[in-house]
Regions:
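Short, acidic/polar
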Residues: 22-34, 104-105, 143, 210-215
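Glycine-rich, proline-tolerant flexible connector loops at the mouths of alpha/beta enzymes
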Residues: 35-70, 162-174
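Structural preference for beta-strand elements that scaffold enzyme active sites
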Residues: 1-3, 40-43, 69-73, 92-95, ...
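Catalytic alpha/beta core domains of metabolic enzymes, predominantly
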Residues: 108, 115-264
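Active-site mouth loops of central-metabolism enzymes
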Residues: 3-29, 94-100, 127-135, 200-208
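Conserved, mostly hydrophobic/aromatic
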Residues: 34, 75, 85, 160, ...
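Alpha-helix-loop-beta-strand connector modules within alpha/beta enzyme cores
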Residues: 6, 52-90, 175-195
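Catalytic beta/alpha-barrel core
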Residues: 43-49, 70-78, 93-103, 124, ...
């Protein structure tokens, strides 16, 4: 499972405060903690006004790279910001994100065409918003993949995000997401499928239980990437266990290795 660590995001109040104060040590500690917990990428999202975003992301990326060798997921809703901010990374990472909205793809996919090491998250939304049914999301998916082919971007560099919605307000959200995930996986075996796991549990008590259950269901359907908190030991344990149960971990070697490294299970003194 590809783990995109979510803990350096300006929408989190403590992170927003650190950004405002330019508290580099706070950002660095979060980067180190996520790397030690088993993250694959470290997401970096400023969540500041767009006119401040490029400079803020530059500072955040410098903080992260000063203490971590992990690639960075450069995160912004603005394609113009992403087109500038990715250049601050000293090694290829992940652009988060594009969608079928406006001309975002035509601003970002040329960057990927020229920079072969970079990957991208593609959201299944368009100018109408988030489609309600699986068929409409898959139509957005087909358009994104047609553009990827046009720009020479292989499926293995794309992380499709089917857009997880709140369980308590979405009548058929789970069925829609599982259908989209399984269909995308069937059509493109080498593509990555990701999700912001915690979106599923907003406004529900004991959110962790919902998050864990959804992760198992989604992985069974074909999810192989997730935006989540890697320092959540229960979540990491469930991910390693599910990979083993799905036959993705020969002889449970990854599960055993992760346990020995202390990534899940009782905290070892």
């Amino acid at each position: 499972m590809i783990i995109i660590g979510e803990k350096i995001n300006g929408s989190i109040p403590a992170v927003a405060e650190a950004i405002a104060k330019r508290d580099a040590e706070f950002i660095k500690k979060r980067a180190i903690a996520q790397e030690e917990a088993g993250a694959t990428f470290i997401d970096c999202c400023a969540s500041v006004p767009e006119e401040q975003e490029v400079e803020t992301l530059k500072w955040m990326i410098e903080c992260i790279e000063s203490v971590s060798d992990l690639p960075i997921a450069v995160d912004s809703p603005s394609a113009d910001v992403l087109a500038q901010a990715y250049k601050f990374c000293s090694r290829p990472g992940l652009i988060n994100s594009v969608s079928g909205e406006g001309d975002k793809i035509d601003k970002i996919f040329p960057i990927l065409a020229e920079n072969k090491g970079w990957q991208v998250i593609a959201l299944l939304s368009d100018d109408t918003g988030i489609p309600k049914c699986a068929a409409d999301r898959l139509r957005v998916f087909d358009k994104i993949m047609a553009k990827a082919k046009e720009y020479g971007i292989s499926p293995s560099r794309i992380h499709i995000d089917p857009l997880v919605e709140m369980l308590c307000t979405s009548e058929n959200g789970i069925e829609t997401n599982i259908e989209v995930i399984s269909t995308v996986r069937e059509r493109y075996p080498s593509i990555h499928i990701t999700a912001a796991v915690s979106n599923i549990s907003f406004n529900l008590p004991v959110r962790k239980m919902i998050n864990l259950g959804f992760t198992v269901l989604a992985m069974n359907a074909g999810l192989d990437s997730a935006i989540l908190d890697p320092t959540n030991r229960d979540m990491m344990g469930v991910i390693f266990a599910t990979e083993a149960l799905l036959g993705l971990d020969d002889y449970c070697m990854e599960y055993i290795g992760a346990y020995r490294e202390g990534l899940f299970g009782p905290v070892k003194n």
